[in-house]
Amino acid sequence: MLKAFKEFAVKGNALDMAVGVILGASFGTIVKSLVDDLIMPPIGLVLGGVDFSNLFVTLRDGAAPGPYASLAAAKQAGAVTLNVGVFANTVVSFTIVAFAVFLLVRGVNTLRERLEGPAAPKQQACPFCFSKIDVRATRCPHCTATIG
């Protein structure tokens, strides 16, 4: 049983999947930092100094009445908040990751098409009646001529 598990774990699919999950998590962390630290601060500055990580709407005050200076202060007071800024950061992060995955898949598909070459035709024209027939056919179903 241990030998079978070792063979499964070392084979390409399980190992490739593990590497993909680890790299995906690391890439997600990098994108989160990119959004939180490099993209959203200039956007917030252009929009009048808005700090997106602290952009929230208080739905119900907590133990201490609002307004709260930050999202952390609202959470500490037990307020119920709608975290609009955190959601905006998450949407931007998702968009970047989705676009990166799209580019990766598109590149892999293009490379695969170049390596495999054009697909073999599945149909041919009958040399007698010019009808489309399967390339494996030995007799034309339209004119009954023998092919081949």
Curated annotation (Swiss-Prot):
GO molecular function term, any single one: mechanosensitive monoatomic ion channel activity
UniProt superkingdom: Bacteria
Any stretches that span the bilayer, and where are they? 15-35, 84-104
User: What Gene3D superfamilies does the record tag this protein with?
Assistant: Large-conductance mechanosensitive channel, MscL, domain 1
A Pfam family for this UniProt protein?
MscL
Sorted UniProt keywords: Cell inner membrane, Cell membrane, Ion channel, Ion transport, Membrane, Transmembrane, Transmembrane helix, Transport
Q: Where in the cell is it found?
A: Cell inner membrane
Q: Name one GO cellular component term.
A: plasma membrane
Membrane topology, as annotated: Multi-pass membrane protein
Family recorded in the similarity comment: Belongs to the MscL family.
What quaternary structure, including any partners, is listed in this protein's UniProt entry?
Homopentamer.
What's the stated role of this polypeptide? Channel that opens in response to stretch forces in the membrane lipid bilayer. May participate in the regulation of osmotic pressure changes within the cell.
The protein depicted here goes by the name Large-conductance mechanosensitive channel
Q: What is the originating organism of this protein?
A: Nitratidesulfovibrio vulgaris (strain DSM 19637 / Miyazaki F) (Desulfovibrio vulgaris)
Gene (name only): mscL
